[in-house]
């Protein structure tokens, strides 16, 4: 780094944000008109943009074109064969010139994790099962605040709330091993983490006492459950950790939350903060290999670094909670990217939950954790701007949700390129960044596919690109969109390899060790 370049302190960084002269201008006033429906302005498009915009990227393929394929993705590999698992399907991506469906409907569940278990010599697939939430409907735009009976769907839900485990060693014949309930009156699970080792980390509220959730679209506050999966056929709960104040009987702690005041009638219902774990807690080094740390995105409570030295007694080591204007509305901290830990940083993003910029813009944060007892925000990613030839001057005027959703999953083939990261950015498409200098992230490429859905149909057309995954060794990017899965390359990542290639290294220490 240039010696003349000053490194921002936490105090200076937050002061700049508060005054609007720093990396992103901030306003603390909440909109007077707000709900989860569309909020067009005179400048807004009256249609969905079906055009494609590309900068510094190439499209290699579109898998399942025209289909809504925005779900989470995971990789597995057997020899030179590589497979992409998504939305219950297994897709053969070995030869990127002709990716093809391999096993359609081979498993149940879209919140998925897959990893190789060396002791069992099997690929183990874990999928989540979640009870209904209290999201807005056409008749109840403010969710549970408009219609308390929306919670009846959660209360009366009779199916599994928890996770399912499968033997995926033969991707053509995936076999269910067990179902694990996190609690019959709880939330089930949303975003989970499994690395093939002894433990899985589940994003859950295990029962109906976790009720202090201000958000209009969730009935409960989730925490982190650690489960022993040494035998995936018989998982066992190890421990549960949550934010004090989340449960009935913890009202004194709840009232200490600044977020407990951000509820109707003090704020408009769809500007309420999302409290608790969005998930998952990422554990980059397996506990049985000496790992002791987990990194979680806890909504309005921000980043929490977990001490997992004793998995039976989870502890909070430290955290960074964003300024209040970022916590009220949407999911302030949605995902933590741990691909820069060797350099002493993590990246965190929020999730915009309302369309047409009917919320404060939620930035992507760079957080210095070299002193893990005191995480310090040092930068925000630049806010995307539309292409010059787009029919709108701001993404707020393009219909749908504008904001980051997910970075690539931590588990992937190859060594993570520490100076490059793509983000799924809803209606702004896929955005790619140079993070060689963590204090000055720079956008270097983008891909914006056509918008899917129908503007006249509630709940469609507002996401565009929801997820992203990277094969670091073959240097290809997968963008999960509502018009298919796009396979992309970017010169900043390197020249893509399209031919079948055995995986010789995975992105984390001992990940999928022993897989052949």
Residue ranges and their predicted role:
Residues 1-12, 16-28, 33-35:
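N-terminal secretory signal peptides
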Residues 13-17, 35-516:
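Feature marking well-ordered beta-strand scaffolds used for ligand recognition
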């Amino acid at each position: 780094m240039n010696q003349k370049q000053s490194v921002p302190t936490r105090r200076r960084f937050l002061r700049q944000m508060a005054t609007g002269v720093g990396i992103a201008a901030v306003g603390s006033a909440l909109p007077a008109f707000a709900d989860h429906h569309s909020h067009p302005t005179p400048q807004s498009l009256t249609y969905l943009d079906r055009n494609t915009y590309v900068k510094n990227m190439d499209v290699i393929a579109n898998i399942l074109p025209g289909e809504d394929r925005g779900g989470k993705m995971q990789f597995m590999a057997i020899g030179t064969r590589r497979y992409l698992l998504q939305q219950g399907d297994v897709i053969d991506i070995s030869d990127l010139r002709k990716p093809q469906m391999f096993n359609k409907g081979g498993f149940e569940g879209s919140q998925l994790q897959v990893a190789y278990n060396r002791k069992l010599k099997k690929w183990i697939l874990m999928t989540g099962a979640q009870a209904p939430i209290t999201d807005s409907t056409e008749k109840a735009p403010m969710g549970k605040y408009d219609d308390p009976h929306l919670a009846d769907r959660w209360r009366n839900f009779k199916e599994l709330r928890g996770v399912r485990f499968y033997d995926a060693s033969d991707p053509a014949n995936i076999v269910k091993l067990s179902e694990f309930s996190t609690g019959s009156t709880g939330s089930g699970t949303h975003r989970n983490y499994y690395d093939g080792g002894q433990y899985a980390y589940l994003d859950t509220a295990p029962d109906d006492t976790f009720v202090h959730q201000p958000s209009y679209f969730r009935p409960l506050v989730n925490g982190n459950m650690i489960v022993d999966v040494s035998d995936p056929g018989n998982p066992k709960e190890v421990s549960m950790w949550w934010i004090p104040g989340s449960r009935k009987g913890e009202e004194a702690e709840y009232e200490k939350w600044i977020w407990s005041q951000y509820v109707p009638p003090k704020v408009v219902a769809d500007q309420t903060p999302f409290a608790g774990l969005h998930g998952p807690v990422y554990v980059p080094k397996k506990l049985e290999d000496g790992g002791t740390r987990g990194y979680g995105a806890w909504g309005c409570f921000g980043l929490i670094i977990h001490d997992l030295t004793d998995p039976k007694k989870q502890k909070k080591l430290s955290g960074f909670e964003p300024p209040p204007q970022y916590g009220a509305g949407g999911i302030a901290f949605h995902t933590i990217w741990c691909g820069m830990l060797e350099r002493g940083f993590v990246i965190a993003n929020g999730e915009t939950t309302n369309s047409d910029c009917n919320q404060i813009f939620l930035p992507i944060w760079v957080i210095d954790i070299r002193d893990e007892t005191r995480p310090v925000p040092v930068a925000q990613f630049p806010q995307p701007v539309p292409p010059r030839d787009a029919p709108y001057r701001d993404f707020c005027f393009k219909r749908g949700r504008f904001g980051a959703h997910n970075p690539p999953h931590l588990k992937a083939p190859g060594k993570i390129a520490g100076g490059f990261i793509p983000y799924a950015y809803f209606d702004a498409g896929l955005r790619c960044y140079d993070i060689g200098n963590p204090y000055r992230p720079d956008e270097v490429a983008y891909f914006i596919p056509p918008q899917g859905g129908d503007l006249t149909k509630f709940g469609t057309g507002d996401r565009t690109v929801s997820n992203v995954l990277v094969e670091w060794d073959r240097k290809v990017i997968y963008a999960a969109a509502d018009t298919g899965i796009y396979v992309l390359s970017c010169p900043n990542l390197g020249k893509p390899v399209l031919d079948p290639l055995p995986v010789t290294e995975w992105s984390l220490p001992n990940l999928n060790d022993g897989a052949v």
